[in-house]
Amino acid sequence: MPVQGSQRRLLGSLNSTPTATPKLGLAANQTGAQCLEVSIPDGLFLSLGLVSLVENVLVVAAIARNRNLHSPMYCFICCLALSDLLVSGSNMLETAVILLLEAGALAARAAVVQQLDNVIDVITCSSMLSSLCFLGAIAMDRYISIFYALRYHSIVTLPRARGVVAAIWVASILFSTLFIAYYDHVAVLLCLVVFFLAMLVLMAVLYVHMLARACQHAQGIAQLHKRQRPAHQGVGLKGAATLTILLGIFFLCWGPFFLHLTLIVLCPQHPTCSCIFKNFNLFLALIICNAIIDPLIYAFRSQELRRTLKKVLLCSW
């Protein structure tokens, strides 16, 4: 992840400097301005990561176990869970290494720590990119299933889904490696921000279009059965509420992180922006919260998956 300054948090922990850069974030503001800084304890950070890790491991295990779930839709959901798993796991690993370095329980040279930091950054960045891509893929899959229902199984085949999955993983790893290598270039930050905005617009357009189709369908059924308008309005309100929750969670969890990147480009030295930079760990914690919420939205709502999950848990005992 892009940072401002010559040190990242792992190196700062190794050198035991009091002004070490927060995890993958920006250096503290030295202007003396009063800032609202939300501190995220390492224990809370590890706890959030552990919850996300367990949830997403269960999703992957359930989908892998049940052959009925080996469909394109669940393929994308499984890969989303795997991406979220890597996001949480990489941040837990970094936090654990930092704690060990600060406690003196782990001895390592600066060069080794730098390489480890680079590897963790690549894993974190690639898993974030792939997570966003799979959210878009799930939205596209649902869109095709609604608007091209009769041709869905000929359009979205398992081999094509696997090809999309492979392309997303390869592209995520490639671009994340380039982003980490050239993190101090403005173009890199702009590319990340544009990518986030593109995914946000794509998801909003697709889900709004699906909501409109659902309302039209409900209206047609109401007219067919000569029902009153409240039934149609109820469907519209329920769909709008679901859409607001889905896109709202996406924006609230991912938006601050990309706002952080945008401000690095627009006002890297401004005191107000520097105050926002201090809360980078909070923004990262929000992304991990999104990794906790994703299984609840996309996976655990499936009865088939829940039944398989119960079998997985019973077998583990």
Swiss-Prot record:
What is the phylogenetic placement of the source species in the record? Eukaryota, Metazoa, Chordata, Craniata, Vertebrata
Against InterPro entries, the record matches this protein to: GPCR_Rhodpsn, GPCR_Rhodpsn_7TM, Melcrt_ACTH_rcpt, MSH_rcpt
Topology of this chain in the membrane: Multi-pass membrane protein
What does the subunit section of this Swiss-Prot or TrEMBL entry state?
Interacts with MGRN1, but does not undergo MGRN1-mediated ubiquitination; this interaction competes with GNAS-binding and thus inhibits agonist-induced cAMP production. Interacts with OPN3; the interaction results in a decrease in MC1R-mediated cAMP signaling and ultimately a decrease in melanin production in melanocytes.
What terms describe the molecular function in GO for this protein? Answer: melanocyte-stimulating hormone receptor activity
The UniProt entry, under PANTHER family, shows: G-PROTEIN COUPLED RECEPTOR
- This protein is called Melanocyte-stimulating hormone receptor
Q: Where in the cell is it found?
A: Cell membrane
Q: CDD domains per the record?
A: 7tmA_MC1R
Give a short account of what the protein does: Receptor for MSH (alpha, beta and gamma) and ACTH. The activity of this receptor is mediated by G proteins which activate adenylate cyclase. Mediates melanogenesis, the production of eumelanin (black/brown) and phaeomelanin (red/yellow), via regulation of cAMP signaling in melanocytes.
Query: What organism is recorded for this protein?
Result: Presbytis comata (Grizzled leaf monkey)
ATP-binding as a keyword?
no
Q: Which residues lie on this side of the membrane: Cytoplasmic?
A: 64-72, 141-163, 212-240, 301-317
Set out the biological process GO terms recorded for this chain's protein. adenylate cyclase-activating G protein-coupled receptor signaling pathway
Tell me which residues are glycosylated: 29
